[in-house]
């Protein structure tokens, strides 16, 4: 029994077939329509019945449109070109003394996502660096590096899904979340509560 390969229109025999998109292909005929890289069955995108690799081809051709995303019809802004080195004079008046460093935190201030030409790679809320698939831990609806998912008070490393949250930031359940945001009252230990010191009984 044989089938016809949708790409080369030659017979496909059972020992050489791969099935994808509801058709049987020769192994080396299942290629991306744009870059012609060999695809694995089920591990590719599809558009109008034709196979495409997910990145970069499908994303560039049919992905979301917008500034710096890279699909058809998007707007790609070029970075400003620096002036040629020959025009810059090297006189001492062009140099400024180094500025002292401030004691700011290491976390970078910036957008929560790093734009790429095929979509978005998220930035870690803990350190501000890109989080790649192999190193990500998903918690609070965002991707984190494993060592960056820490309690905001005691800095203990947390496990995804087994910690408390307040204003989008992670806290360990005990003692930090309870101490900071738990109920207020006698001997609980928060601001505004009454903590009684043990009474020293001295004989007079």
From Swiss-Prot:
Biological processes, Gene Ontology terms: T cell proliferation
Domain of life from the UniProt record: Eukaryota
Expressed in which tissues: Expressed specifically by the thymus.
GO terms of molecular function: metal ion binding
Positions of the LIM zinc-binding domain: 3-64, 122-183
Region (Disordered): 88-107
Keyword annotations of the record: Cytoplasm, LIM domain, Metal-binding, Repeat, Zinc
A GO cellular-component term linked to this record: cytoplasm
Gene3D superfamilies with a match to the protein in the record: Cysteine Rich Protein
Keyword Lipoprotein: no
Localisation per UniProt entry: Cytoplasm
Alphabetical list of PANTHER family matching this protein: CYSTEINE-RICH PROTEIN 3, CYSTEINE-RICH PROTEIN CRIP FAMILY MEMBER
Protein name per the record: Cysteine-rich protein 3
Source species: Mus musculus
Name of the gene: Crip3
């Amino acid at each position: 029994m044989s089938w016809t390969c949708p790409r080369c229109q030659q017979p496909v025999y059972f020992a050489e077939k791969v099935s994808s998109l509801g058709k049987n292909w020769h192994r080396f005929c299942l290629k991306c329509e744009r870059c012609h890289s060999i695809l694995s069955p089920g591990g590719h995108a599809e558009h109008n019945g034709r196979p495409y690799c997910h990145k970069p081809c499908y994303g560039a051709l049919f992905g979301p449109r917008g500034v710096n995303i890279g699909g058809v019809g998007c707007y790609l802004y070029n970075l400003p070109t620096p002036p040629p080195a020959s025009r810059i004079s090297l006189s001492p008046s062009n140099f400024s003394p180094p500025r002292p460093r401030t004691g700011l935190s290491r976390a970078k201030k910036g957008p929560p996502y790093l734009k790429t030409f095929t979509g978005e790679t998220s930035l870690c809320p803990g350190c501000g660096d890109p989080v790649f698939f192999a190193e990500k831990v998903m918690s609070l609806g965002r991707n984190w590096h494993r060592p960056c998912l820490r309690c905001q008070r005691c800095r203990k490393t947390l496990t995804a899904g087994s910690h408390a949250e307040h204003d989008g930031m992670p806290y360990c359940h005990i003692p930090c979340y309870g101490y900071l945001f738990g109920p207020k009252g006698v001997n609980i230990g928060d601001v505004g509560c009454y903590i009684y010191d043990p009474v020293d009984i001295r004989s007079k």
